[in-house]
Regions:
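Gly/Gly-Pro- and Ser/Thr-rich, intrinsically disordered tail segments characteristic of DNA damage-repair
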Residues: 1-256, 263, 404-461
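A generic structural signal for short beta-strands and their flanking turns/coil linkers
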Residues: 23-25, 160, 312, 330-334, ...
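Core structural elements
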Residues: 103, 310-324, 381-393
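Short, charged/polar, Gly/Pro-enriched secondary-structure boundary elements
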Residues: 111-116, 325, 389-396
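Short intrinsically disordered coil segments
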Residues: 120-125, 331-334, 397-403
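DNA-contacting surface of Y-family translesion DNA polymerases
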Residues: 209, 217-375
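Acidic, metal-coordinating catalytic segment for phosphate/diphosphate chemistry
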Residues: 337-461
Length: 461
């Protein structure tokens, strides 16, 4: 069996962890530069706010209705996500993190039985005076309680509510988690372990919400009169093969209980990107753009080292807004290949800056007398690392002028200090100190778990 743990309204739940006064109140989280709504609590959904609502259009309404508004705090969200995933690893030996707020895990009765035997003395109320063997004889008791226990423990330990779905396939597990989230009667876990339960769940589930069914496929199925997952699952395999591709066929098989997507370890990324859109009118100062690109390159190298990889390809891009008719348009997009694969930030930052400087536009003079010096307003920039390979073993070069052993120790020391004291404690001079390219985040919460200056203070008597 496969389980899926899905954090409920994750970004909003993260903001509530350190703000218990927001429990039961509407909460929304905004996108980069406070552009639009990207997360809503159940209370905010009930007030009619939609995903993607432009903030400037709903700001006054939110303030009038007492909605708690937050800018995106990805440092906090990432930290709490790591805590949730760490908790899940105590319940299953195989974890497959799908996103920041979702993770698949291996789940079966033997695993649940072992867990409960080890913790029976600590949790006697879980069994209601029944033995574990007696629970195992009931068709759903053990696995359902196992999933409910995971949900309750994560909420108690981390403060994040999660919904658990357990089924024979990943697709069915995702459907189960949706039901667990929607209906409180499931007590945090929906178990789909029989054909009867599977068909009942599929008959209530819209086809457009099935994992793996995109908008175009959903429209095609709707045109064919198929509006629920059950109607699609009941079709013959030959019919599915004749109308759809192999990906949709795999989804059909998963809906019918045939596992086609197994639990896997998190695969190594084929490319790593860090980018950002800039607030207001954008950036016109070349020095600020260089600071931004340097910081993006450093972020990429941190991710690279974290997954134990090196890279040989680097791409830098930056562009102006296409929608501002009063300033000139310009696009930077270029790449280079390093002679030796590396994950050292001084090498990658240097290469990224060389790309930017080579392609940066020269000062231009406009022909109009009222605009003798027009500048470029860059609205977005980023760095991409590619040709990624494992750090061990790494291809060596007989004539490499760099002491790689010494360089590796330096990177390990920098990473350790920055992990302990916060991002940017040790940085290259080109990164700057005041983050002149930072996002517009007027509703930013504190970094309660990663910045020692933001740790909550508790008064004792």
């Amino acid at each position: 069996m496969i389980g899926l743990a899905d954090c409920n309204n994750f970004y909003c739940s993260c903001e509530r962890v350190f703000r218990p006064d927001l429990t039961g109140k509407p909460v929304v989280v905004l996108s980069n530069n406070d552009g639009c709504v990207i997360a809503r609590s159940e209370e905010a959904k009930a007030l009619g706010y939609k995903m993607g609502d432009p903030f400037y259009q709903v700001k006054e309404k939110m303030e009038a209705e007492g909605v708690a508004i937050f800018s995106s705090n990805y440092t906090l969200y990432g930290s709490l996500s790591n805590r949730v995933m760490s908790m899940l690893s105590h319940y299953s030996p195989r974890i497959d993190q799908y996103s920041i707020d979702e993770s698949f895990f291996e789940a079966d009765e033997s695993m649940a039985k072992v867990f409960f035997r080890e913790h029976a003395e600590d949790h006697p109320t879980l069994f209601n005076k029944m033995t574990i063997d007696e629970l195992s004889e009931k068709p759903d008791s053990l696995l359902h309680r196992y999933g409910s226990k995971i949900s309750a423990d994560v909420l108690r330990a981390v403060g994040i509510p999660i919904s658990v779905g357990i089924a024979e396939t990943k697709t069915l597990a995702k459907i189960g988690s949706k039901f667990a989230k929607k209906y409180k009667g499931f007590q945090g876990c929906c178990l789909i372990d029989t054909d009867e339960r599977r068909h009942k769940a599929l008959s209530l589930f819209p086809i457009e919400d099935v994992w793996g069914i995109g908008r175009q496929i959903a429209r095609k199925l709707d045109y064919m009169g198929i509006r629920t997952a059950a109607q699609f699952a009941d079709k013959k395999e030959s019919w599915v093969r004749s109308h759809f591709n192999i990906t949709t066929l795999r989804t059909w098989k998963e809906l019918n209980g045939e596992s086609c997507i197994s639990i896997e370890e998190l695969p190594q990324k084929k490319s790593i990107c860090t980018s950002r859109s800039f607030a207001d009118e954008g950036i016109t100062d070349k020095n600020v753009i260089e600071e931004a690109v340097a910081n993006f390159a450093v972020r990429c190298t941190e991710k690279l080292r974290r997954q134990g990889s090196v890279c040989q390809g680097i791409t830098v891009f930056a562009w102006t807004s296409r929608f501002n008719e009063h300033v000139p348009e310009y696009t930077i997009h270029d790449s280079l290949t390093l002679p030796i694969a590396t994950n050292a930030q001084e090498e990658i930052v240097g290469a990224a800056l060389s790309i930017l400087r080579a392609k940066y536009p020269k000062p231009m003079a406009d022909s109009r007398p009222d605009r003798s010096d027009m500048s470029f307003h860059f609205k977005k920039a980023g760095v991409i690392l590619w040709q990624i390979s494992p750090d061990h073993p790494r291809q060596q070069d007989l004539f490499d002028p760099i002491d790689r052993s010494k360089q590796k120790k330096l990177m390990e020391a920098i990473d350790a200090i920055n992990r302990k004291n916060g991002y940017g404690t040790i940085r290259q001079a080109i990164q700057g100190t005041d983050c002149r390219f930072d996002l517009k985040r007027e509703y930013m919460s504190k970094q309660f778990t990663t910045n020692i200056h933001d740790i909550l203070k508790v008064k004792t008597r």
